[in-house]
Structures are given as structure tokens and as C-alpha cells.
Amino acid sequence: MIDDQDLGFIANFLGIFIFALVIAYHYVTADPKYEAT
């Protein structure tokens, strides 16, 4: 069974994971003409 502690850990992990995916997706699909030095 999943208790409150596991549920909080899963929610926190998913939040961080999805946030990281969004950041990575933004940097990959950002304006290709822009080159960061």
C-alpha cells in the first residue's frame, strides 16, 4: 500500500521530473538561430 509519505515523495518527484522535462524541452526547441556562448 502507498501511505502519505510515499504519496508525497511520488508527487514531489513527479513535479521535479516534469519541471525538468519542460526546461529541457524549452532549451531544445527554443529559437535555433540563437546561440548561447
Swiss-Prot record:
InterPro entries: Oligosaccaryltransferase, OST4_plant, Ost4p_sf. Keywords: Endoplasmic reticulum, Membrane, Signal-anchor, Transmembrane, Transmembrane helix. It is found in: Endoplasmic reticulum membrane. The keyword Membrane applies. The chain crosses the membrane at residues 8-28. It is a single-pass type III membrane protein. Its main location: endoplasmic reticulum. Component of the oligosaccharyltransferase (OST) complex. Subunit of the oligosaccharyl transferase (OST) complex that catalyzes the initial transfer of a defined glycan (Glc(3)Man(9)GlcNAc(2) in eukaryotes) from the lipid carrier dolichol-pyrophosphate to an asparagine residue within an Asn-X-Ser/Thr consensus motif in nascent polypeptide chains, the first step in protein N-glycosylation. N-glycosylation occurs cotranslationally and the complex associates with the Sec61 complex at the channel-forming translocon complex that mediates protein translocation across the endoplasmic reticulum (ER). All subunits are required for a maximal enzyme activity. PANTHER family: DOLICHYL-DIPHOSPHOOLIGOSACCHARIDE--PROTEIN GLYCOSYLTRANSFERASE SUBUNIT 4A, DOLICHYL-DIPHOSPHOOLIGOSACCHARIDE--PROTEIN GLYCOSYLTRANSFERASE SUBUNIT 4A-RELATED. Belongs to the OST4 family. This is Dolichyl-diphosphooligosaccharide--protein glycosyltransferase subunit 4A. The lineage of its organism: Eukaryota, Viridiplantae, Streptophyta, Embryophyta, Tracheophyta. The gene is OST4A.
